[in-house]
Amino acid sequence: MRKILKLKIGRDELVFETGFMAKQANGSVLATYGGSSVLATVCCSSNVREDLDFVPLSVEYNEKYYAAGKIPGGFIKREGKPKDKEILVSRLIDRPMRPLFDKRFGREIQVIPTTLATDQLNPPDIVGMNAAFTAVFLSDIPFNGPIAAVRMVYLNGKFIVNPSFEEIHDSDLDIVVAGSLNGITMVEGGANEVGEDILLSAIDGAHEYIKQICNAQKEFLDIVGKKEKLPLAFEEKIFEFKDELRDFVYADLKEACFVKGKLNRDKAITLLRNKSYEYFSSLEKLTDSNESLFHKAFDDFEKEIVRSSILNDNIRTDGRTPNEIRDIISEVDILSRTHGSALFTRGETQALAVTTLGTSIDEQIMDDIDGDKRLNFMLHYNFPPFSVGETGRLMTGRREIGHGHLAQRALESMVPGKNDFPYTIRVVSEVLESNGSSSMATVCAGSMSLMSAGVPVKGQVAGIAMGLISEGDKYVVLSDILGEEDHLGDMDFKVAGTKNGITGFQMDIKIENVTKDLMRDALEQARIGRIHILSIMNTVISNSRVGISKYAPKIVQLQIDIDKISLVIGSTGKTVKAITDEFEVKVQIEQNGKIILFGDDDFKMQKAKERIESIVREPKVGEIYEGTVKKINSFGAFIELTPAKEGFLSTRLKPRDSKYGSGRFGNSNRYSRFGGGGENIRGNAGLVRPPKLEEGQRIKVKIIDIDKFGKIDLEIVRDKDY
């Protein structure tokens, strides 16, 4: 039976419906906000595995073109592989949900939110998140919900919940917040140099709406009726010889956990693991059934040692204090042929960023259901296996897309608009080493690379990854976390920004008791760390270079009247093609009359600009052109001044010193219609014979008259008068 629940969030109602679509799934919910609707389903496999130490969850958010009344572009007229946007939304759904599933369930879980309709006003991603969370909460799969999500923006001094696309575009802060009744579990977004207090207020305000949606889900569960939960596949087991393992390895492990250097530390811990494994195997205390329990017990000891040292002694595995940042080395211009490059090294994390400048032809065209877009700024993040000393395939996965998107958001508010810098900008980050915070190293390297390339950015941007170790009311915030601290800690949040404020933010919280005071302390510690990193980066490069690389395409811009665009294009594009071929330039003509020329030769580009200016310029008496003889008749020749203008050159004999008084030609003909370019006729020194003209010949002419109908009369100009 169809069940419906409605609640007001922001300017529209959020509507949940179930019991009439996808009824064979373990759970299904159709969520609607405004005119945007998403159907979310959740299913689990019937196969049970007891050897899993993780939650086998997959989220496949997908958008259908029919939702916006569109047919896919290109040759293939159906939806294909997931777009970056769909992957990013899938990650937004996955991250707050994954910790709430029980590992002991032992079955593969798949959540599929499908966008069925969009009104081009309300973004469907938030609708999809709440549809997915509610579908799982209503299902028979064990889940520690409810959770919910909202988007908050800061616009004109006010916070707006679940804003429109236009409000998002115009805002100074745009974040997606997910959480439960007890607290926040995930935050992600970008900003235009906002302060920490604004971010905190946005998160705090978002939680109030999240609690409303969570309570609505509980009410909806009462309406629909609770399903009997599926049984857990296995009970959590403990290695039966855990105490003996502790006695055997704990003291040595405490030393191994604090060996300097990631590779050395990993090697020392692995040696102890192998030694312990061999010892217990020799005692015949290890079997196939408890081998995984042995490794879990060993990992628990390592986690206990590291967390205890941080909480009680303020000492981290690499010897740093909680707020200490690793040594930083920065370089720029290390690649000679690229348009801009920078190498940023922080401890054992290293990122090489390379900036390339292109033309408007290089813009990325986004064919999305919320409207076609053209991106002129892109950041691509690569994480090759050698960065962590491993082998593997070179491929772009969801992690790479997510990290690249975070770094791009951190930098894009500092990148100038197309009107100020009409280049397409692509930044590629190659992570060469990784031991935590590679996405924030990408932000730092990317910022310096943009400056190296001469992109007039508004300010230098740095990023830092923060962590948290807590126990009860006691907590320690960590600056510039290592990979193991991310894994063993209670919170991972990344903050990027300038000296003036935050530009990018991502936070994942594994515990529920994160207070506002704790978050304020963490953000302040992150701000201090960010300023420290910026000070080091600024010693290498603090402002954008004046001018761009000699290897980058050159740009010349000019503005013409809109009604003259057709003159520049010409019949069937003939005129603009001639300019392109003759001067070896690319010509971009915009609807507002702005013309952008791209090329490699400054001289040819200037000549192309002059040609366009001559095409659109209104002719005036006295101006000189180099024209082409197009047609000759018994009275004279028609001279093409520009592809859109012709003048007439009379070939009749004229007195060399004739004056035209008040006649049609006025007093502008100083010598003759031929400007002295003809020859005297024998026996008639006062008359001049016109020079011989041929069609296609290039000659210099001067405008001597323009009548009221726009007809242009010309005379030949001698070289010395030109």
UniProtKB/Swiss-Prot annotation:
Residues 553-612 form the KH domain. It is found in: Cytoplasm. CDD domains: KH-I_PNPase (cd02393), RNase_PH_PNPase_1 (cd11363), RNase_PH_PNPase_2 (cd11364). Mg(2+) binds at D486, D492. Transmembrane segments: none annotated. Its main location: cytoplasm. One of its GO terms (cellular component) is cytosol. Coiled coil: none annotated. Keywords: Cytoplasm, Magnesium, Metal-binding, Nucleotidyltransferase, RNA-binding, Transferase. GO terms for molecular function: 3'-5'-RNA exonuclease activity; magnesium ion binding; polyribonucleotide nucleotidyltransferase activity; RNA binding. Signal peptide: none annotated. One of its GO terms (biological process) is mRNA catabolic process. Its EC number is 2.7.7.8. PROSITE patterns: KH_TYPE_1, S1. Its cofactor is Mg(2+). It holds the Pfam family PNPase. It catalyses: RNA(n+1) + phosphate = RNA(n) + a ribonucleoside 5'-diphosphate. Gene3D superfamilies: GHMP Kinase, N-terminal domain, K Homology domain, type 1, Nucleic acid-binding proteins. Residues 622-717 form the S1 motif domain. Involved in mRNA degradation. Catalyzes the phosphorolysis of single-stranded polyribonucleotides processively in the 3'- to 5'-direction. Belongs to the polyribonucleotide nucleotidyltransferase family. This is Polyribonucleotide nucleotidyltransferase. It comes from Borreliella burgdorferi (strain ZS7) (Borrelia burgdorferi). The lineage of its organism: Bacteria, Pseudomonadati, Spirochaetota, Spirochaetia, Spirochaetales. The gene is pnp.
